[in-house]
């Protein structure tokens, strides 16, 4: 059965043949992988469906199980999400700690832009005011962290007002999309300035399946969800011997 196929309880998804000793020895490890990755893909599919029709894309995160990142990110892609960063090498993300170490948000962005790495530059905003500052600094994307839906709407409105007033920095040279390290999945890479005249907007923090639709608002391009990989329940799978001939 091809991966990504939706199944119902009781459906046989695969058949294997081999020596009984080998099959029974590998049973638990094989099921652990299948249950874990199928659970990630299943939860991801639910999030993707929750925002259908809005144009918003679901992103995974680096909050993955140690040593399983490549597999878990493949599972989120099978579920319909876009892969975010695989590591620190394929995108610059300025967060609160980076800003503190660099001497402030503006200084952190300045230092990042001074390095011609050809990587997308994303910066985290914790308030509407920080988002406004980042928009004037010319970042590719602004990550709104732990915003309420009303704060997201207010931020988009204010950024568009800044754009109309000509107060946003011009676009950086277009950032090439980078291929994912496995599975041929495209890594989400922002364009310099979105068609709306403002940096792309990503929303993260406090996002659950029950409320994600509330955050899929006009002006939002991405919603990143750590729960896809750090909180996905395992799919209930079992292996049964039915022929010993």
Sequence positions of predicted segments:
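Extended hydrophobic secondary-structure segments
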Residues: 143-149
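Short secondary-structure boundary segments
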Residues: 146, 205, 227
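Intrinsic disorder/low-complexity segments
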Residues: 164-198
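Active-site catalytic pocket residues across diverse enzymes, especially alpha/beta-hydrolases
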Residues: 159, 163
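Active-site loop ensemble at the mouth of alpha/beta enzyme cores that anchors a bound cofactor
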Residues: 238-245
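Acidic/glycine-rich phosphate/pyrophosphate-binding loops and surrounding catalytic core
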Residues: 1-126, 130-137, 141, 153-158, ...
